[in-house]
Amino acid sequence: MNQTLIQEILEVVEQAAIASAKLTGLGQKDEADAAAVEAMRLRMGKIEMKGKIVIGEGERDEAPMLYIGEEVGSGNGPGVDFAVDPCEGTNLCANNQRGSMAVLAASDTGGLFNAPDFYMNKLAAPPAAKGKVDIRNSATENLKILSNCLDLAIDELTVVVMDRARHKGLIKEIRECGAKIQPISDGDVQAAIACGFAGTGTHCLMGIGAAPEGVISAAAMRALGGHFQGQLVYDPAIAQTSEWADYTKEGNIKRLNEMGITDIDKIYEANELASGENVIFAGSGITDGLLFDGVKFEKDCTRTSSLVISTLDSTCRFTNTIHMKDGAKSISL
Protein backbone atom coordinates (compact mmCIF):
# COMPACT_ATOMS: atom_id res chain seq x y z
CA MET A 1 0.00 0.00 0.00
CA ASN A 2 1.27 3.48 -0.85
CA GLN A 3 0.35 7.16 -0.96
CA THR A 4 -0.99 6.92 -4.51
CA LEU A 5 -3.54 4.40 -3.30
CA ILE A 6 -5.06 6.99 -0.94
CA GLN A 7 -5.97 9.27 -3.85
CA GLU A 8 -7.26 6.38 -5.94
CA ILE A 9 -9.47 5.13 -3.11
CA LEU A 10 -10.86 8.64 -2.67
CA GLU A 11 -11.87 8.63 -6.33
CA VAL A 12 -13.52 5.22 -5.88
CA VAL A 13 -15.95 6.50 -3.24
CA GLU A 14 -16.49 9.79 -5.08
CA GLN A 15 -17.61 8.01 -8.24
CA ALA A 16 -19.89 5.68 -6.30
CA ALA A 17 -21.47 8.63 -4.48
CA ILE A 18 -22.10 10.55 -7.70
CA ALA A 19 -23.72 7.55 -9.38
CA SER A 20 -26.03 6.91 -6.45
CA ALA A 21 -26.86 10.58 -5.90
CA LYS A 22 -28.42 10.81 -9.35
CA LEU A 23 -31.26 8.72 -7.92
CA THR A 24 -31.61 10.55 -4.61
CA GLY A 25 -35.22 11.04 -3.56
CA LEU A 26 -36.70 8.87 -6.30
CA GLY A 27 -37.63 6.02 -3.99
CA GLN A 28 -35.43 3.61 -5.93
CA LYS A 29 -33.12 2.19 -3.27
CA ASP A 30 -32.13 -0.94 -5.22
CA GLU A 31 -31.35 1.07 -8.34
CA ALA A 32 -29.31 3.57 -6.30
CA ASP A 33 -27.32 0.74 -4.77
CA ALA A 34 -26.75 -0.91 -8.15
CA ALA A 35 -25.51 2.36 -9.66
CA ALA A 36 -23.05 2.86 -6.81
CA VAL A 37 -21.82 -0.73 -7.07
CA GLU A 38 -21.17 -0.44 -10.79
CA ALA A 39 -19.34 2.89 -10.46
CA MET A 40 -17.22 1.64 -7.55
CA ARG A 41 -16.31 -1.57 -9.37
CA LEU A 42 -15.38 0.31 -12.55
CA ARG A 43 -13.02 2.72 -10.74
CA MET A 44 -11.45 -0.05 -8.65
CA GLY A 45 -10.60 -1.92 -11.83
CA LYS A 46 -8.24 0.89 -12.88
CA ILE A 47 -6.05 0.69 -9.76
CA GLU A 48 -2.65 -1.03 -9.90
CA MET A 49 -3.25 -3.58 -7.17
CA LYS A 50 -4.17 -7.15 -6.37
CA GLY A 51 -7.44 -6.27 -4.68
CA LYS A 52 -9.97 -8.57 -3.07
CA ILE A 53 -13.45 -7.94 -1.68
CA VAL A 54 -13.73 -9.50 1.79
CA ILE A 55 -16.92 -7.68 2.78
CA GLY A 56 -19.20 -6.71 -0.06
CA GLU A 57 -22.60 -7.07 -1.66
CA GLY A 58 -23.07 -10.71 -0.69
CA GLU A 59 -21.93 -14.14 -1.82
CA ARG A 60 -20.95 -14.72 -5.43
CA ASP A 61 -24.34 -16.18 -6.34
CA GLU A 62 -26.14 -13.24 -4.70
CA ALA A 63 -24.35 -10.29 -6.31
CA PRO A 64 -23.05 -9.71 -9.86
CA MET A 65 -20.32 -7.30 -8.70
CA LEU A 66 -18.33 -6.60 -5.54
CA TYR A 67 -19.27 -10.00 -4.16
CA ILE A 68 -17.24 -11.58 -1.36
CA GLY A 69 -14.03 -13.02 -2.77
CA GLU A 70 -14.12 -11.03 -6.02
CA GLU A 71 -10.72 -9.90 -7.26
CA VAL A 72 -10.51 -6.23 -8.20
CA GLY A 73 -7.79 -4.02 -9.64
CA SER A 74 -5.25 -4.67 -12.38
CA GLY A 75 -3.87 -7.83 -10.81
CA ASN A 76 -0.47 -6.19 -10.34
CA GLY A 77 0.88 -4.28 -7.37
CA PRO A 78 0.20 -4.50 -3.65
CA GLY A 79 -2.32 -6.90 -2.16
CA VAL A 80 -5.29 -4.99 -0.76
CA ASP A 81 -8.40 -6.30 1.01
CA PHE A 82 -11.60 -4.24 0.87
CA ALA A 83 -14.74 -3.96 2.95
CA VAL A 84 -17.22 -1.97 0.87
CA ASP A 85 -20.68 -0.49 1.16
CA PRO A 86 -21.18 1.45 -2.09
CA CYS A 87 -24.43 3.02 -0.89
CA GLU A 88 -24.64 2.89 2.88
CA GLY A 89 -28.15 3.93 3.79
CA THR A 90 -30.02 2.97 0.63
CA ASN A 91 -33.31 4.00 2.24
CA LEU A 92 -31.79 7.35 3.17
CA CYS A 93 -30.73 7.90 -0.44
CA ALA A 94 -34.09 6.78 -1.83
CA ASN A 95 -35.94 9.15 0.50
CA ASN A 96 -33.44 12.03 0.29
CA GLN A 97 -32.68 11.83 4.00
CA ARG A 98 -29.46 12.69 5.81
CA GLY A 99 -26.58 10.26 6.27
CA SER A 100 -26.24 8.19 3.09
CA MET A 101 -22.72 7.76 1.77
CA ALA A 102 -20.40 5.61 -0.34
CA VAL A 103 -17.90 4.02 2.00
CA LEU A 104 -15.08 1.49 2.19
CA ALA A 105 -12.19 0.31 4.31
CA ALA A 106 -8.94 -1.05 2.89
CA SER A 107 -6.00 -2.86 4.40
CA ASP A 108 -3.13 -5.17 3.56
CA THR A 109 -4.09 -8.70 2.55
CA GLY A 110 -5.63 -10.42 5.57
CA GLY A 111 -5.94 -7.14 7.46
CA LEU A 112 -9.75 -6.97 7.77
CA PHE A 113 -12.02 -9.29 9.76
CA ASN A 114 -14.26 -11.22 7.39
CA ALA A 115 -17.45 -10.41 9.26
CA PRO A 116 -20.44 -12.64 8.54
CA ASP A 117 -23.73 -11.08 7.50
CA PHE A 118 -24.88 -10.97 11.11
CA TYR A 119 -25.67 -8.23 13.59
CA MET A 120 -23.17 -6.66 15.95
CA ASN A 121 -23.47 -4.83 19.24
CA LYS A 122 -21.27 -1.74 18.92
CA LEU A 123 -19.70 0.90 21.10
CA ALA A 124 -17.92 3.90 19.57
CA ALA A 125 -16.44 6.79 21.52
CA PRO A 126 -13.88 9.62 21.17
CA PRO A 127 -10.10 9.09 21.45
CA ALA A 128 -10.16 10.54 24.98
CA ALA A 129 -12.30 7.59 26.09
CA LYS A 130 -10.34 4.89 24.26
CA GLY A 131 -9.79 1.88 26.48
CA LYS A 132 -11.80 3.44 29.29
CA VAL A 133 -15.38 2.86 28.23
CA ASP A 134 -16.18 -0.80 27.68
CA ILE A 135 -18.99 -2.61 25.88
CA ARG A 136 -19.24 -4.98 28.87
CA ASN A 137 -20.38 -2.08 31.03
CA SER A 138 -23.93 -0.85 31.33
CA ALA A 139 -24.84 2.29 29.41
CA THR A 140 -25.01 4.08 32.76
CA GLU A 141 -21.42 3.16 33.64
CA ASN A 142 -20.12 4.14 30.23
CA LEU A 143 -21.86 7.51 30.34
CA LYS A 144 -20.24 8.26 33.70
CA ILE A 145 -16.82 7.32 32.32
CA LEU A 146 -17.41 9.31 29.13
CA SER A 147 -18.49 12.31 31.18
CA ASN A 148 -15.20 12.24 33.08
CA CYS A 149 -13.09 11.67 29.96
CA LEU A 150 -14.64 14.58 28.08
CA ASP A 151 -15.09 16.85 31.09
CA LEU A 152 -18.77 17.21 30.26
CA ALA A 153 -21.82 16.72 32.42
CA ILE A 154 -23.89 13.67 31.49
CA ASP A 155 -26.75 15.92 30.41
CA GLU A 156 -24.36 17.48 27.87
CA LEU A 157 -23.70 14.13 26.19
CA THR A 158 -25.47 12.95 23.04
CA VAL A 159 -25.66 9.25 22.19
CA VAL A 160 -26.54 7.97 18.73
CA VAL A 161 -28.76 4.88 18.71
CA MET A 162 -30.46 3.11 15.81
CA ASP A 163 -34.22 3.64 16.04
CA ARG A 164 -35.20 0.01 16.50
CA ALA A 165 -37.56 -1.85 18.86
CA ARG A 166 -34.61 -3.81 20.25
CA HIS A 167 -33.16 -0.59 21.66
CA LYS A 168 -36.20 0.41 23.71
CA GLY A 169 -34.53 -0.54 26.99
CA LEU A 170 -31.20 1.02 26.02
CA ILE A 171 -32.83 4.31 25.07
CA LYS A 172 -34.78 4.35 28.34
CA GLU A 173 -31.60 3.80 30.37
CA ILE A 174 -29.67 6.52 28.53
CA ARG A 175 -32.45 9.06 29.03
CA GLU A 176 -32.83 8.17 32.69
CA CYS A 177 -29.14 9.03 33.10
CA GLY A 178 -29.87 12.47 31.67
CA ALA A 179 -28.04 12.08 28.35
CA LYS A 180 -29.64 12.99 25.03
CA ILE A 181 -30.58 10.49 22.33
CA GLN A 182 -30.01 11.13 18.64
CA PRO A 183 -31.98 8.37 16.88
CA ILE A 184 -31.03 7.32 13.36
CA SER A 185 -33.12 5.20 11.01
CA ASP A 186 -30.30 3.69 8.97
CA GLY A 187 -26.56 3.89 8.36
CA ASP A 188 -24.52 3.88 11.56
CA VAL A 189 -21.02 4.13 10.02
CA GLN A 190 -21.00 7.91 9.76
CA ALA A 191 -22.47 8.20 13.25
CA ALA A 192 -19.74 5.98 14.71
CA ILE A 193 -16.97 7.99 13.06
CA ALA A 194 -18.53 11.31 14.08
CA CYS A 195 -17.85 10.31 17.69
CA GLY A 196 -14.15 10.60 16.91
CA PHE A 197 -14.37 14.31 16.08
CA ALA A 198 -14.98 17.09 18.57
CA GLY A 199 -17.62 19.58 17.51
CA THR A 200 -20.00 17.15 15.80
CA GLY A 201 -22.33 17.14 18.78
CA THR A 202 -22.10 13.34 18.84
CA HIS A 203 -20.25 11.74 21.74
CA CYS A 204 -21.05 8.04 21.58
CA LEU A 205 -22.67 5.31 19.49
CA MET A 206 -24.37 2.43 21.28
CA GLY A 207 -26.47 -0.51 20.16
CA ILE A 208 -26.91 -3.17 17.53
CA GLY A 209 -26.36 -2.72 13.81
CA ALA A 210 -24.97 -4.70 10.88
CA ALA A 211 -21.68 -6.54 11.48
CA PRO A 212 -20.06 -5.78 8.08
CA GLU A 213 -20.51 -2.05 8.64
CA GLY A 214 -18.98 -2.57 12.08
CA VAL A 215 -15.71 -3.58 10.42
CA ILE A 216 -15.71 -0.42 8.30
CA SER A 217 -16.39 1.72 11.39
CA ALA A 218 -13.64 -0.08 13.29
CA ALA A 219 -11.14 0.60 10.51
CA ALA A 220 -11.96 4.30 10.59
CA MET A 221 -11.79 4.54 14.36
CA ARG A 222 -8.53 2.62 14.51
CA ALA A 223 -6.97 5.03 12.00
CA LEU A 224 -8.46 7.98 13.88
CA GLY A 225 -7.41 6.76 17.32
CA GLY A 226 -10.97 6.49 18.61
CA HIS A 227 -12.65 3.74 20.59
CA PHE A 228 -14.58 0.95 18.92
CA GLN A 229 -15.70 -2.44 20.15
CA GLY A 230 -18.04 -4.96 18.58
CA GLN A 231 -19.65 -8.23 19.60
CA LEU A 232 -21.54 -10.48 17.19
CA VAL A 233 -25.25 -10.97 17.88
CA TYR A 234 -26.60 -14.40 16.95
CA ASP A 235 -29.81 -14.65 19.01
CA PRO A 236 -32.91 -13.61 16.99
CA ALA A 237 -34.62 -12.69 20.27
CA ILE A 238 -31.97 -10.00 20.79
CA ALA A 239 -31.70 -8.82 17.17
CA GLN A 240 -35.49 -8.50 16.91
CA THR A 241 -35.52 -8.25 13.13
CA SER A 242 -37.93 -9.63 10.56
CA GLU A 243 -34.91 -10.63 8.46
CA TRP A 244 -34.27 -13.41 10.96
CA ALA A 245 -37.90 -14.53 11.22
CA ASP A 246 -37.01 -18.05 10.08
CA TYR A 247 -33.67 -18.24 11.92
CA THR A 248 -32.93 -19.85 15.28
CA LYS A 249 -30.23 -19.17 17.84
CA GLU A 250 -28.90 -22.71 17.41
CA GLY A 251 -28.89 -22.38 13.63
CA ASN A 252 -26.99 -19.10 13.78
CA ILE A 253 -24.39 -20.59 16.13
CA LYS A 254 -23.92 -23.43 13.65
CA ARG A 255 -23.46 -20.91 10.82
CA LEU A 256 -20.79 -19.07 12.81
CA ASN A 257 -18.98 -22.31 13.63
CA GLU A 258 -19.02 -23.29 9.96
CA MET A 259 -17.37 -19.94 9.18
CA GLY A 260 -14.59 -20.75 11.63
CA ILE A 261 -15.89 -18.49 14.39
CA THR A 262 -15.90 -20.67 17.51
CA ASP A 263 -15.59 -17.95 20.16
CA ILE A 264 -19.06 -16.68 19.38
CA ASP A 265 -19.20 -14.26 22.33
CA LYS A 266 -15.81 -12.66 21.69
CA ILE A 267 -15.60 -8.90 22.07
CA TYR A 268 -13.58 -7.48 19.20
CA GLU A 269 -11.45 -4.37 19.56
CA ALA A 270 -10.87 -2.01 16.63
CA ASN A 271 -7.38 -3.39 16.04
CA GLU A 272 -8.81 -6.91 15.77
CA LEU A 273 -11.51 -5.99 13.28
CA ALA A 274 -8.96 -3.97 11.28
CA SER A 275 -5.66 -5.65 12.13
CA GLY A 276 -3.55 -4.84 9.08
CA GLU A 277 -0.35 -2.84 9.31
CA ASN A 278 -1.91 -0.21 7.06
CA VAL A 279 -5.57 0.81 7.20
CA ILE A 280 -7.44 3.31 5.03
CA PHE A 281 -11.02 4.49 5.46
CA ALA A 282 -12.80 6.50 2.77
CA GLY A 283 -16.31 7.88 2.64
CA SER A 284 -18.07 10.30 0.30
CA GLY A 285 -21.44 11.85 1.01
CA ILE A 286 -24.43 10.92 -1.12
CA THR A 287 -26.78 13.04 0.98
CA ASP A 288 -25.78 15.61 3.59
CA GLY A 289 -24.68 14.11 6.88
CA LEU A 290 -22.91 14.58 10.20
CA LEU A 291 -19.42 14.80 8.71
CA PHE A 292 -19.78 16.04 5.15
CA ASP A 293 -22.24 17.23 2.55
CA GLY A 294 -23.83 15.11 -0.11
CA VAL A 295 -23.29 15.38 -3.86
CA LYS A 296 -24.25 18.73 -5.40
CA PHE A 297 -25.12 18.85 -9.09
CA GLU A 298 -24.52 22.22 -10.74
CA LYS A 299 -24.67 23.49 -14.32
CA ASP A 300 -20.96 23.15 -15.08
CA CYS A 301 -19.79 20.76 -12.40
CA THR A 302 -20.56 18.18 -9.76
CA ARG A 303 -19.28 18.65 -6.21
CA THR A 304 -18.41 15.90 -3.75
CA SER A 305 -17.47 16.07 -0.08
CA SER A 306 -15.40 13.23 1.31
CA LEU A 307 -13.27 12.00 4.18
CA VAL A 308 -10.16 9.80 4.03
CA ILE A 309 -8.43 8.58 7.19
CA SER A 310 -5.15 6.70 6.82
CA THR A 311 -2.57 5.06 9.06
CA LEU A 312 -0.13 5.20 6.14
CA ASP A 313 0.71 8.82 6.89
CA SER A 314 -1.40 9.42 10.02
CA THR A 315 -3.70 11.83 8.21
CA CYS A 316 -7.36 12.71 8.17
CA ARG A 317 -8.38 14.54 5.00
CA PHE A 318 -11.69 16.30 4.45
CA THR A 319 -11.84 16.82 0.69
CA ASN A 320 -14.16 18.95 -1.42
CA THR A 321 -13.79 18.08 -5.09
CA ILE A 322 -15.17 19.90 -8.12
CA HIS A 323 -15.70 17.50 -11.02
CA MET A 324 -15.81 19.82 -14.04
CA LYS A 325 -17.96 19.05 -17.06
CA ASP A 326 -16.62 19.33 -20.59
CA GLY A 327 -16.88 22.91 -21.80
CA ALA A 328 -17.45 24.29 -18.31
CA LYS A 329 -17.67 28.09 -18.48
CA SER A 330 -18.20 29.14 -14.89
CA ILE A 331 -17.24 27.41 -11.65
CA SER A 332 -18.33 29.11 -8.44
CA LEU A 333 -16.49 28.83 -5.14
From Swiss-Prot:
CDD domains tied to this protein: FBPase_glpX
Presence of keyword Cell wall biogenesis/degradation: no
Reaction(s) this enzyme catalyzes, per UniProt: beta-D-fructose 1,6-bisphosphate + H2O = beta-D-fructose 6-phosphate + phosphate; D-sedoheptulose 1,7-bisphosphate + H2O = D-sedoheptulose 7-phosphate + phosphate
Binding site for Mn(2+) 2: D85, E88, E213
Xref: SUPFAM superfamilies: Carbohydrate phosphatase (SSF56655)
InterPro entries with a match to the protein in the record: FBPase_class-2/SBPase
GO MF: fructose 1,6-bisphosphate 1-phosphatase activity; metal ion binding; sedoheptulose-bisphosphatase activity
Binding site for substrate: E88, G89, T90, Y119, R164, A165, R166, D186, G187, D188
Organism domain of life: Bacteria
EC numbers on record: 3.1.3.11, 3.1.3.37
Pathway note: Carbohydrate biosynthesis; Calvin cycle
UniProt keyword annotations, A-Z: Calvin cycle, Carbohydrate metabolism, Hydrolase, Manganese, Metal-binding
GO BP term (any one): gluconeogenesis
UniProt: Mn(2+) 1 binding residues: D33, E57
Family, similarity comment: Belongs to the FBPase class 2 family.
Subunit and partners: Homotetramer.
Functional description taken from the UniProt entry: Catalyzes the hydrolysis of fructose 1,6-bisphosphate (Fru 1,6-P2) and sedoheptulose 1,7-bisphosphate (Sed 1,7-P2) to fructose 6-phosphate and sedoheptulose 7-phosphate, respectively.
Stored PANTHER family: FRUCTOSE-1,6-BISPHOSPHATASE 1 CLASS 2-RELATED, FRUCTOSE-1,6-BISPHOSPHATASE CLASS 2
Protein name: D-fructose 1,6-bisphosphatase class 2/sedoheptulose 1,7-bisphosphatase
The organism of origin for this protein: Prochlorococcus marinus subsp. pastoris (strain CCMP1986 / NIES-2087 / MED4)
Lineage: Bacteria, Bacillati, Cyanobacteriota, Cyanophyceae, Synechococcales
